[in-house]
Design a protein with these regions (language model features):
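N-terminal Sec signal peptide cleavage junction
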Residues: 24-27
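Bacterial N-terminal signal peptides
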Residues: 11-22
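Bacterial N-terminal signal peptides that target proteins for export
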Residues: 1-13
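Structural signature of tandem-repeat unit edges
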Residues: 8, 37, 42-45, 57-74, ...
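Secondary-structure capping and domain/repeat boundary segments
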Residues: 62, 132-134, 138-253
Length: 253
């Protein structure tokens, strides 16, 4: 019996030592960056958004960046301490009564319930690709993609995904992401309220957003509006809104 207890004690000590060494090798730093609270682990070249700062809670629009301080943003939530795997957390501090829409620049994972305490959030825009999973939180919001990615992901029974109706183009050959810099979605007949961050291109200066590839007529975010809503009667005899794209093209100087 004593020998057995001794073995159990040794195993317990070894386990505790392993956990302590693991904790030491993965030292944690919690910092504020822009509108976000962020967690860094010294043993990983990644960053984890854990919540919003006080200023972040007052923003109507938020962009989830691809990188923070040179580290790829891989998750909204926590890292599993024991396995080191991603653990999207429903308890992350993403709380806001003001936030209306979230833009994902890259593929960052989370859960729909991550935003369950953002009572006014209605739209999530995926600039690159899908990166948020469904769960049983019962959060009601809509998800938007480029038309091409929407067609790939389209499910006739899914009432939450839509093609974005505002498409910002890099406007040069060989651009990444099929030439899309940004996408957005606003009601037809309305102004575009959110102006995306300025794109960058080596050797060039960004010169504004234009209505055609030749960059003749600049889009005025103060006065220009999207086309008026048009409807048609579908095969089931129901009225539905006709999808209309508004493409804006970057000018390079």
């Amino acid at each position: 019996m004593k020998r057995r207890l001794c073995k159990i004690l040794v195993a317990t000590i070894l386990m505790a030592t392993t956990l302590m060494l693991s904790a030491c090798s993965g030292c944690v730093r919690n910092e504020e960056w822009g509108y976000f609270t962020v967690k860094f682990y010294d043993d990983r070249e990644t960053a984890y958004i854990t919540g919003l700062t006080e200023e972040g809670q007052q923003q109507r629009f938020l962009v989830i960046p691809k990188e923070i301080k040179g580290r790829k943003v891989v998750c909204i939530g926590e890292r599993n301490f024991l396995t080191g795997r991603l653990l999207p957390s429903i308890s992350s501090e993403m709380k806001s009564d003001v936030l209306e829409r979230v833009y994902f620049e890259g593929i960052t994972y989370g859960l729909t319930s991550t935003f369950s305490e953002c009572s006014n959030l209605k739209k999530i825009i995926f600039i690159d690709d899908w990166g948020t999973g469904y769960d049983s939180a019962g959060v009601s919001m809509k998800y938007y993609f480029t038309p091409e990615k929407y067609r790939i992901k389209y499910n006739p029974y899914d009432t939450q995904t839509f093609p974005a109706n505002i498409l910002y183009r890099f406007n040069y050959e060989g651009a990444e992401n099929d030439g899309y810099y940004w996408i957005d979605d606003y009601d037809y007949g309305n102004r575009i309220e959110f102006i995306p961050p300025e794109p960058e291109r080596d050797g060039y200066t960004f010169g504004g957003w234009y209505k055609e590839p030749e960059c003749i007529n600049e889009w005025n975010f103060e006065t220009d509006v999207l086309p008026e809503k048009c409807t048609e009667i579908n095969e089931d005899g129901e009225e539905e809104v006709i999808y209309q794209e508004t493409k804006l093209y970057a000018k390079w100087i």
